[in-house]
Amino acid sequence: MAMAIDGYECTVCGDCEPVCPTGSIVFRDDHYAIEADSCNECTDVGEPRCLGVCPVDLCIQPLDD
């Protein structure tokens, strides 16, 4: 499973990018996105780190299959 950023909710603050241990959060086309193929939902710490720093509720959610 992977996480996804809602482009409508994202304020483009950039807080999530530096905390991603896999480098899965990228800035392209004027918004942040999570590359699903490399996102592991930070399984080593129990919760995605991006969720802990994002100031917007429901901006980052599990990716729908």
Curated annotation (Swiss-Prot):
Keywords: 4Fe-4S, Electron transport, Iron, Iron-sulfur, Metal-binding, Nitrogen fixation, Repeat, Transport. It holds the Pfam family Fer4_7. Its cofactor is [4Fe-4S] cluster. Residues 2-30, 32-65 form the 4Fe-4S ferredoxin-type domain. Binds 2 [4Fe-4S] clusters. The keyword Iron applies. One of its GO terms (biological process) is nitrogen fixation. GO terms for molecular function: 4 iron, 4 sulfur cluster binding; metal ion binding. [4Fe-4S] cluster 1 binds at residues 10, 13, 16, 54. [4Fe-4S] cluster 2 binds at residues 20, 39, 42, 50. Gene3D superfamilies: 3.30.70.20. It comes from the Bacteria. This is Ferredoxin-like protein in vnf region. It comes from Azotobacter vinelandii. The lineage of its organism: Bacteria, Pseudomonadati, Pseudomonadota, Gammaproteobacteria, Pseudomonadales.
